[in-house]
Curated annotation (Swiss-Prot):
It is found in: Cytoplasm. The gene is ureD. One of its GO terms (molecular function) is nickel cation binding. This is Urease accessory protein UreD. Belongs to the UreD family. Keywords: Chaperone, Cytoplasm, Nickel insertion. GO terms for cellular component: cytoplasm.
Length: 295
């Protein structure tokens, strides 16, 4: 007897292949003699460090993270990790903006996870370029910093929604952002933000007010009220307060700066100014601007 074959329409559909491009890097830095050495750099995919730089006399290690693709499409995932041993000092930055590209009707996500672990007496400055969220993106961004003892951290996260100047506003899509700072297992700062183009939060005055640039700077330093007032006046004289709103807040052992506006240039300029003005308070030495910012 011949077997009865099922109709083609009743056969289970072959699952569509998922596109996924993973990349990651884990750095280990330790104090060796008179400078901080990059002890190991374990990576997979297109994410790596070319070589460490030492532009400062105290041996602080400057690291440029290179990601040749330049951005993440739907399905991509990027992991950045660094561990600093006792007494290590490092400044980590990126040569260009990160990008989360969009795709119509995408159900998969793309994302970047950053995690730093700092031992006692270590110091990390995380100063990346901005991340651009393209129209139609479906992204997640996470930054977590674990501090031990008297470890110090200075970092910022800058979000650019769409590319208005290029006629590509952020009309559709979403991106969930999470920022965390912990010291000895206790939270210093935890914040969750969801950038959703169609939401009231994106449009209303109590939310983003249709601004296309949103940024947060956090630093484990203590400033006086007078110092903060003087810094606000200096930002105004610098000409960066006309395109957005600035908020400077001193919490217990944590200094927080926020920018909400429409100029990535003014945001970067203001953040760099604050970093240069406070670095001596933060780690006792003048700012040494990474050369890659000027190329």
């Amino acid at each position: 007897m011949n077997a009865i074959l099922p109709k083609i329409s009743t056969l289970p559909a072959k699952p569509a292949p998922t596109r996924e491009w993973l990349a990651g890097i884990d750095l280990l830095l330790a104090k060796r003699y008179q400078r901080t050495a990059l002890m190991s750099s374990k990576h997979f995919g297109p994410l790596r460090v070319q070589r460490p730089f030492y532009p400062e006399p105290d041996g602080c290690c400057h690291i440029y993270l290179l990601h040749p693709p330049g951005g993440l499409v739907i399905g991509d995932n990027l992991h950045i990790g660094a561990s600093l041993q006792q007494g290590a000092q490092a400044l980590i930055t990126t040569p260009s903006a990160g990008k989360l590209y969009g795709a119509k009707g995408a159900s998969e996500k793309q994302g970047q996870q950053v995690e730093f672990n700092l031992a006692a007496e270590s110091c990390l400055e995380w100063l990346p370029q901005e991340t651009i969220i393209f129209d139609g993106a479906n992204g997640t961004l996470s930054t977590k910093v674990n501090l031990t003892g008297n470890a110090q951290y200075f970092g910022w996260d800058i979000i650019r929604l769409g590319r208005v100047a290029s006629g590509e506003p952020f009309n559709t899509g979403t991106c969930a952002q999470r920022l965390q700072l912990w010291r000895d297992g206790l939270p210093l700062f935890i914040e969750k933000t969801k950038f959703e183009a169609s939401s009231n939060m994106h449009r209303e005055k109590w939310g983003l007010q249709n601004a296309n640039t949103c940024a947060t700077l956090t630093a484990t330093l203590q400033l006086t009220r007078d110092s903060i007032d003087e810094m606000l006046e200096a930002l105004a004289q610098l000409g960066v307060t006309n395109t957005g709103e600035w908020g400077l807040t001193q919490k217990e052992s944590l200094f927080i700066v926020r920018y909400l506006g429409n100029s990535i240039t003014d945001c970067r300029k203001g953040f760099e100014f604050i970093w240069q003005q406070t670095r001596a308070v933060f780690n006792g030495k003048p700012a040494e601007v990474p050369r890659i910012w000027r190329t």
